Amino acid sequence: ITQVDHKVEVLYSGHVVISDTITVTGQLPDSFLIGFPYKYSAFILKGTAYDSTYKILPMTLGVQMQSQSGFYGSSIDIPSGSSQVFTIVFILSNGVLTTTNNGYKLDFPAYPSFVTTVSQCNVNVDLPTGTNIIGIDKTDGSVNSTTYQKNNLPAFTYSPATATFSAVYGYIQDVNIPTLNRQVNISPSGAITCTDNYKIINNSTSSISSFIFNLPPTATNVV
């Protein structure tokens, strides 16, 4: 493995998306293992993988990391002819986020775990608007930046980390959305109308006066 780009993105709901874009050289294996410290298994909601052409790769969650214990592993099938670059994505619940007096603490894997050494691992912790990083504590040293790098990342790296950051009130909303009903209509002229019905559960002690939604850039007549 020549390079891994490890991105940890905190969403406005407090959920976390971890994506690892992996570049390999030489002959591709039939399958590929990636893991995290086992404690994060309780928060994983979904995993998916795709190659550089966005073709979905079969993925199995909750497998053994060879003979190593203490890891939550996932196996990705690599079909013949796949590209040398592929991405693995995990969605974690907002249970990895806890409140502080002026913001939050994020419990996350500082690096992914592999069965072989990684030449270079680049890490980016992507926080929402209205937040400011205070520091990241990890086993190989603390940093006060949202980006850091590790050369020659050892196989079976076990590295939980904690990111502490301040946040403007209301920018992160501790909620769950258990149901979403979507209805899409296409008119004879080709116009598309989409109606979403959400059920939102507020997990915080304060009330929610507004909620942030991401819409397509070409969306119009939003009500």
Language-model features: locations:
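Lumenal/extracellular ectodomains and adaptor appendage modules
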Residues: 1-223
